[in-house]
Curated annotation (Swiss-Prot):
Swiss-Prot/TrEMBL GO biological process terms: RNA repair; tRNA 3'-terminal CCA addition
Organism annotation: Methanosarcina mazei (strain ATCC BAA-159 / DSM 3647 / Goe1 / Go1 / JCM 11833 / OCM 88)
Coiled-coil annotated spans: none
Annotated binding of Mg(2+), by residue: D71, D73, D125
Assembly description: Homodimer.
Sites where the protein binds CTP: S59, R62, H148, K167, Y176
Chain sites annotated for binding ATP: S59, R62, H148, K167, Y176
Gene: cca
Gene3D superfamilies (alphabetical): Archaeal tRNA CCA-adding enzyme catalytic domain, Beta Polymerase, domain 2, CCA tRNA nucleotidyltransferase, domain 2, Poly(A) polymerase predicted RNA binding domain
Requisite cofactors: Mg(2+)
NCBIfam families: cca_archaeal
GO MF, any single term: magnesium ion binding
UniProt KW keywords: ATP-binding, Magnesium, Metal-binding, Nucleotide-binding, Nucleotidyltransferase, RNA repair, RNA-binding, Transferase, tRNA processing
Enzyme class: transferase
Protein name from the UniProt record: CCA-adding enzyme
């Protein structure tokens, strides 16, 4: 592979033309940020809350936001000695006062509550935090964010375009976003990669040769060993891995994306074509071509945020696969899709049916005690077809309890280890549909997922 392939300035400029905020966008963002800061201060004064600082953080504050994204993070910091209870009561009080001027508001919860609002078309998080003196002495996880902000702002000047290119490139490779649904690269991690390697081009070339266990320590101050595929030691906290949320698959998808791009640098790596929803006819043709069994477990989507939902869905996906394997069904792959109102866990099997007979092999005949116990268990039992000795061991052919994957899932799924909210939803009712029956699911986003699936 030729890693010396140059990435043309024309290509980078063509991408930046689509993703770099215009002067009008920047002015609007700054005006809204100023308004929000004034609203927070006015709310604090109205509620007689003193000694709070307002700080804009995140990509909007650092000049590394993509055109068309309207996210603002407003941190309301309280003195370090403030109790957690006071922080929540007074911080959320200020946030709710600001929300009176918003188009929409929703309480959310990370380590402690914060408020998400839509204000003049911008998606805004109002986050109370403690004003600690060091990112190594946190009282809550969000307290480190202002330190991240200062570190990036002091080093990113002149490289903002490289960050924008990298973010869009990662989006094109479906690896951008550190939320638990995606398990990819966070914005902060992306910025640190650009700071460390120096440019978009250098980062892509370096990443094309990464291996699991890659470690980057900008400040050379790491204090702990980490086991994740990529370790980016937090410059503000030597014990923390910024890339902890990055899964092995997304790490490897990024490596592959970089390699393919370097072979032939094209705009499609930034803006891939969006797949169309698959139609019934094409799906049925794919089924006929694959000659496998497709199963879909369908249930009502739990009313929880994605960071709560998706770990539970991945847990259910694994539990269903393990259950099928335990009963001798061969699982090819699994996947999850979630929308409103339904969630679907997909499973592809070599076959959805098994014969009535199952072979049970016991210990060698000469291991007398165990061999006789095994023989006594099966000899003459009504669910046994017959027995014989093979390779010196007792063998009995018995009736298989579950001969269809669908029947097994219908009877045993609720006995699997499922997350709390997913279990509650599945317990209300679920359906297992297979093969051509899956055409009953008409949601267009699901049909896009289904196209990728087959």
């Amino acid at each position: 592979m030729d890693t010396d392939t140059s990435i043309s300035e024309d290509l980078k400029l063509a991408v930046l033309e689509k993703i770099k905020p215009t002067e009008a966008e920047r002015k609007e963002l700054m005006a809204v940020q100023d308004e929000l800061a004034a609203e927070v201060k006015a709310a604090a004064e109205k509620l007689c809350v003193s000694d709070i600082f307002v700080k804009m953080v995140g990509s909007a504050a650092r000049g590394t936001w993509l055109s068309g994204t309207h996210d603002i993070d407003v941190f309301i910091s309280f003195p370090e000695e403030t109790s957690r209870k006071d922080l929540e009561i007074r911080g959320m009080g200020i946030a709710r006062e600001v929300a009176k001027h918003a188009e929409y508001a929703e309480d959310r919860h990370a380590e402690h509550p914060y408020l998400n609002i839509v204000y003049k078309g911008f998606d805004v998080d109002l986050v109370p935090c403690f004003r600690v003196c060091s990112a190594c002495q946190l009282k809550s996880a969000v307290d480190r964010t202002p330190f991240h902000n200062e570190f990036i702002k002091s080093r990113i000047k002149g490289r903002e375009d490289d960050v924008l290119l990298m973010k869009q490139f990662m989006r094109g490779g479906r690896v951008y976003g550190s939320e638990l649904k995606t398990q990819g690269f966070s914005g902060y991690l992306t910025e640190l990669l650009i700071i460390y390697y120096g440019s978009f081009e250098k980062t892509v070339k370096a990443a094309s040769s990464w291996k699991p266990g890659k470690k980057i320590d900008i400040m050379q101050h790491s204090e702990l060993e980490h086991s994740e595929p990529l370790v980016m030691v937090d410059p503000t906290d030597p014990k923390r891995n910024v890339a902890a949320a990055l899964s092995l698959d997304k790490f490897c998808m990024f490596i592959d994306h970089c390699r393919e791009f370097l072979k032939s640098p094209e705009i499609k790596f930034f803006f891939p074509e969006s797949p169309l929803p698959i139609e019934d006819k094409e799906f049925l043709e794919k089924l006929e071509s694959r000659k496998t069994s497709q199963l879909a477990i369908v249930f009502e989507t739990p009313d929880v945020v994605d960071d709560v939902l998706y770990p539970q869905l991945y847990k259910m996906e694994q539990a269903a696969s393990s259950l099928l394997s335990e009963y001798d069904f061969s699982v090819i792959k699994t996947g999850v899709w979630s929308g409103k109102p339904q969630t679907v866990v997909m499973l592809e099997l070599i076959s959805g049916t098994l014969p009535n007979v199952k072979k049970r092999t016991g210990p060698p005949v000469w291991v007398r005690e165990h061999a006789e116990k095994f023989k006594d268990k099966y000899e003459g039992a009504e669910n046994v077809f017959g027995g014989y000795i093979e390779n010196g061991k007792y063998v009995y052919e018995v009736h298989r309890k579950y001969t269809t994957a669908k029947g097994l899932l219908e009877e045993q799924l609720l006995n699997c280890s499922l997350g709390k909210q997913v279990y509650q939803s599945v317990n209300k009712g679920f359906e297992v549909i297979e093969n051509a029956e899956i055409c009953r699911l008409k949601d267009q986003d699901f049909r896009v997922f289904l196209r990728k699936w087959v």
